[in-house]
């Protein structure tokens, strides 16, 4: 089952992982204005992911943090591009811990809810027998 959490207010999102184990996420970021950096920080774990790129209004970025499937894809005017190289040094492809994960995000270094829309999707993982 896939769970979806859309952005909340004030540059913050709470994502509750009801799985029986940690899981990766698929993060969709849609830019409503030009930007040069975006940082998504899991304040629950201290992990963060920072991208630096010449983002344009209308760009969509899809970040996959699932183990074995890590990717960063830009969709611009219907064209898909691999922008893995935009990942900044020290960034982490974080996993969602069991329970609540509090995320804050910065666009060009400031909390911003006007210039981006963010959606988290993740699989609920259950341990087998």
Show where each model-derived region lies:
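Intrinsically disordered, low-complexity segments enriched in serine, threonine, and glycine
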Residues: 1-129
